[in-house]
From Swiss-Prot:
It is an enzyme of class 1 (oxidoreductase). This is Probable medium-chain specific acyl-CoA dehydrogenase 2, mitochondrial. Gene3D superfamilies: Acyl-CoA dehydrogenase/oxidase, N-terminal domain (1.10.540.10), Butyryl-CoA Dehydrogenase, subunit A, domain 2 (2.40.110.10), Butyryl-CoA Dehydrogenase, subunit A, domain 3 (1.20.140.10). It catalyses: a medium-chain 2,3-saturated fatty acyl-CoA + oxidized [electron-transfer flavoprotein] + H(+) = a medium-chain (2E)-enoyl-CoA + reduced [electron-transfer flavoprotein]. Its EC number is 1.3.8.7.
């Protein structure tokens, strides 16, 4: 359905021209895409969120529905069978799905991080095979970089690869791999130069590894604080043989490939936090209009009004930053600066929401308790809040040193 919307009366070239200019208004096609995603979110995700949170079951049926509507992997180009949507359009979908449930959203859009390095560094054969498969079927792919001793410090990756003939042999373990139990293929980063003094930019090689390759062991599903239906596991590689044609980008350039993916995907992470915050504001306002204290609805108390107004202001500011970062990607500009600003500010506002609900917010009968648990991960993945601040400060200082101003 959304594939057709993306090809309506506005041509793709004209649409790209419009989305590549900062605008405070969405065009009609973007509004239709957003409305369709939000309709699916409210009708399918919201009613099922608590069930999947409790069971921890992977939401295959919902994933299949999302794929049939064009809501899964919408950024895959048309030439590989996808809808060919822009980053901004994809961001609108992530925001709308996250309004319903960020765990279910991650089940649907989780392959995005694995897609990015293939899109950036893959050759035509790799893109046709692996992006084409994701466009054709509701399957999962995983970004397989984090290790037990290497999270934000990607240079600390210990998984190694050794070239033998026309193959590479991979050995090592990866941790916290989203979708790891169901992935048809993995993006894997491994150290190809054993010399610890070799710069990161030359020490690692990136691979596409098929999920059914001999030597891959998928660990148990982790029991996480939030987003419980998302499948997170340890993946172990023991003498895994990968053909040379599955090297992604030049040998030794894997670190750059892995890091470049974040510039494409951070707007989506920010959009996930944004959709959750949007839901928080809606739940807060509805509760304030219903709950009574001291003889009137709590919405009539100034302290509550201040809380709601602060949430509304911060939400709209985050939305503008997130949309700007998505527009930056469509414009070929690094998005980390703006996306990092948006992704690093979520949890304090969720805490205020919990305070508004008081004891009811501490109880699972109300949605706030789950929203609080689901929100925490946004301070961690694709760079902790502290790492996001480092990214922001480095880009800021570099820009001032070069241009004499902080204005980007």
């Amino acid at each position: 359905m959304l594939s057709r919307l993306a090809r309506t009366q506005i041509s793709r070239s004209a649409l790209l021209s419009q989305t590549r200019q900062l605008s405070f208004d969405l065009n009609e096609t973007q509004k239709e895409i957003q409305a369709a995603a939000l309709k699916f979110s409210k009708e399918v995700l919201v009613p099922n969120a608590a069930k999947f949170d409790e069971s921890g079951e992977f939401p295959w049926e919902i994933i299949r529905q999302a794929h049939s509507l064009g809501l899964m992997n919408p950024q895959i180009p048309e030439k590989y069978g996808g809808p060919g949507m822009t980053t901004l359009e994809t961001t609108l979908i992530v925001e709308a799905l996250s309004y319903g449930c960020t765990g279910l959203q991650l089940g649907i859009m989780g392959p995005s991080l694995a897609i990015a390095p293939v899109y950036i560094a893959g050759n035509e054969e790799q893109k046709k095979k692996y992006l084409g498969a994701l466009a054709a079927e509701p399957i999962i792919a995983s970004y397989c970089v984090t290790e037990p001793g290497a999270g934000s410090d990607v240079n600390g990756v210990k998984t190694k690869c050794e070239k033998k003939g026309n193959e590479y042999i991979i050995n090592g373990s990866k941790a916290w791999i989203t979708g790891g139990g169901h992935a048809k293929w993995f993006f894997v980063l491994a150290r190809s130069d054993p010399n610890p003094k070799t710069p990161a930019g030359k020490a690692f090689t990136a691979f596409i590894v098929d999920g059914d390759t001999s030597g891959i062991t998928r660990g148990k599903k982790e029991k996480n604080m939030g987003q419980r239906c998302s499948d997170t596991r340890t993946i172990t590689f023991e003498d895994v043989r990968v053909p040379e044609e599955n090297v992604l980008g030049p040998p030794g350039a894997g670190f750059k490939v892995a890091m470049s993916a974040f510039d494409m995907t951070r707007p989506g992470v920010a959009a996930g936090a944004l959709g959750l915050s949007w839901r928080c504001l809606d739940e807060s306002a509805k509760y304030a209009l219903q709950r009574k204290a001291f003889g009137t609805e709590i919405a009539n108390h100034q302290a509550v009004q201040f809380m709601l107004s602060d949430m509304a202001i911060n939400l709209e500011l985050a939305r503008l930053i997130t949309y700007k970062s998505a527009t930056d990607v469509d414009n070929g500009v690094r998005s980390s600066y703006n996306a990092s600003k948006s992704a690093s500010q979520r949890i304090p506002r969720i805490r205020r929401l919990l305070m508004l609900f008081r004891c009811n917010g501490f109880n699972s009968e109300y949605p706030v308790e789950k929203l609080m648990r689901d929100a925490k991960i946004y301070q961690i993945y694709e760079g902790t809040s502290q790492i996001q601040r480092i990214v922001i400060s480095r880009m800021l200082l570099g820009h001032v040193a070069q241009n004499g101003t902080s204005r980007m």
